Amino acid sequence: MDSAAPALSPALTALTDQSATADLAIQIPKCPDPERYFYTSQCPDINHLRSLSILNRWLETELVFVGDEEDVSKLSEGELSFYRFLFAFLSAADDLVTENLGGLSGLFEQKDILHYYVEQECIEVVHSRVYNIIQLVLFHNNDQARREYVAGTINHPAIRAKVDWLEARVRECASVPEKFILMILIEGIFFAASFAAIAYLRTNNLLRVTCQSNDLISRDEAVHTTASCYIYNNYLGGHAKPPPDRVYGLFRQAVEIEIGFIRSQAPTDSHILSPAALAAIENYVRFSADRLLGLIHMKPLFSAPPPDASFPLSLMSTDKHTNFFECRSTSYAGAVVNDL
C-alpha cells in the first residue's frame, strides 16, 4: 500500500507549481539602483552599533554554571519560585522578540540596518540558549520538571498581562513608527525589572555565572533598544510619528504593567529582595522609561532619579579587570549606553 506523500508548505507548493510550468529565473530590474548590488554605508549610527555588537559577541559555551547549581539550594522556597518564574518569562519573551525581528528588517533597504539585524538575531539565539541552561540549573537539571513548570506558568496572569497588552497594542497599531515604540517598550521596559532582580543575587554572592550572563544580556538589550530608538528617529521618513500623547500613554501603561509584574511575584520571605530593593527596582523601571524617552527626543514622564551607586546594575558601568578565575570577561569593548 502506497503511503501518502507529505504535504508541502504553501511556499514550497507555489514553487513546485511554478517549476512545473516554467523555468525559474532571477528577475533583475530594468533600471536597478547600483547600490543594491554592493555595500555602502548609509546609516553610520546603526553601523556603529553593529560594530559594537560584533566586538562583544559571546556564546553560551563560554559560561560554566557548575557553581550556580550549588547555590540553588541556598535560595529560600519563595526566592527559588520567583527566579524560576522570571526565567520562564524571559525565555518566552526573548523568543518572541526573535520571531518579530524578521518582520522589522523586511521594512528596510539600507544594508546597515539589515546587517545590524543579522547581528541582533544571532545574539538573541545565544540569549535563548543561556536561558535554557539557567532554567535547568534552577530545576536541578530535571528537564521534565522544567517542562511541566513552564507549561503551567506561561499563561500566568502576570505574564498574560504583558502579552495581552502587547497583542492589543499591535492590533490597534496605526503606523510603522508605533511598532518601533512597542519594540522599545518590550526590550527596554518589559525586561528591566527582571534584569534588576537577577542582579540582586550578586549582592549575596549567589549564582555568580547567572549574574555574569545577566550583565551580558542586559548590555546586549541596551544596544538593541538604542538601535530601535535610532531607527525611530532617523530612518522612518515618510511615516507619520504617533502624537506625543499616544507615546506617553504607551510608556505609562508599560511601566505600570512592569511594576505590577514584579510586585505580584516578589517573594515575601527573601533576604535578597527587601522592600527597599523592590522600591529601587521600581524606580529603575521609571528611570529607564525616562531615559528611553530622551533617546527619542521627548521629555521625561516620571522625572525619576538615577539609581544610586549601591544598585546592583550599577556594577555594569564600572571598569572590570578579568581575573584568572573568571570564566568569561564581561567587559564591553566600546561605549555602551545603558540605563545608568
Curated annotation (Swiss-Prot):
Record's keyword annotation contains Membrane: yes
Matching Gene3D superfamilies: Ribonucleotide Reductase, subunit A
Stored InterPro entries: Ferritin-like_SF, HSV_RIR2, RNR-like, RNR_small, RNR_small_AS, RNR_small_fam
Transmembrane segments: 180-200
GO MF annotation list: metal ion binding; ribonucleoside-diphosphate reductase activity, thioredoxin disulfide as acceptor
Pfam families: Ribonuc_red_sm (PF00268)
EC numbers on record: 1.17.4.1
SUPFAM superfamilies, alphabetized: Ferritin-like
Catalytic reaction list: a 2'-deoxyribonucleoside 5'-diphosphate + [thioredoxin]-disulfide + H2O = a ribonucleoside 5'-diphosphate + [thioredoxin]-dithiol
Self-association and partners: Heterotetramer composed of a homodimer of the large subunit (R1) and a homodimer of the small subunit (R2). Larger multisubunit protein complex are also active, composed of (R1)n(R2)n.
Protein name: Ribonucleoside-diphosphate reductase small subunit
Organism of origin: Human herpesvirus 1 (strain 17)
